[in-house]
Amino acid sequence: MEQFDALLAQTIDSTLGLRCTLFGYQYSEILRSLMCVYLCGGSCVEDISTHLMKHLSLHPTLRTCSADTILRAIEELTCKNNTYKSASGKSYDFNTADKMNCLLIKALLATGQLKSGQKYDFDFDHQFIETEKYDAKPTYKKFFYDMNNGFGWNRLPKSFMAQNTVFLLMTALIRNFYKAIMQRLKTREFGLRATSRIKTFVFQVHLCSCKMD
């Protein structure tokens, strides 16, 4: 939790803006609270209020917000859909979520996963070009398996895709932070590898804690 604040809190709040001045939770605290759901073995946003709050609230300095606050923040950060009308007359809605996508990139720079001064291509193209080659199924299937089972993508919290887009980007940021921490951690001491999935991480850390007790 402290590493999250040290590496990302300033970046999050400067990009998304201050959510409150006197009372309430900043967006960095809300994202950290959501991160705790998955680093503690939870599977959905509601787990933080149902199972984790009584433990996380014992931290002497860092505050943890409720599931309702996380869900309100998702609504606050939701952007309107853009509608594109094709030449055939069909309309398509898409959501750019510019601020959250910008945060995702800035967070990667803050953790050192992207390097300042380097060139990166973030362009996304919907054009489909038919080829005779197979797609990289192991790559994207592994990613979706990881996000579905480790970071809540199989239990989206909202009914509308615009709101769920914010959640998907929030958890993508958390996943990137987890990857950054695993690169810094002495993983062998916990029976882990830098590429270990988050569920394996949670199990091994709890196992080591039991052995210490």
Please provide the spans of the model-predicted regions.
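Short amphipathic alpha-helical "interface-anchor" segments enriched in bulky aromatics
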Residues: 48, 137-161, 166, 170, ...
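Hydrophobic alpha-helical scaffolding
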Residues: 20-23, 38, 60, 137, ...
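Structural beta-strand/beta-sheet cores of well-ordered domains, especially the beta-sheet scaffolds
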Residues: 118-122, 149, 164-171, 201-203, ...
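General structural signal for alpha-helix termini and helix-helix connectors
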Residues: 54-58, 153, 183
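Dynamic "connector" segments at or just before major functional cores
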Residues: 1-139, 208-213
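A short, flexible helix-boundary coil/loop motif
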Residues: 177-213
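Short helix-capping/linker segments at secondary-structure and domain boundaries
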Residues: 6, 41-46, 176-187
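Short runs of predominantly hydrophobic/aromatic residues within well-ordered alpha helices
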Residues: 27-34, 45, 166, 170, ...
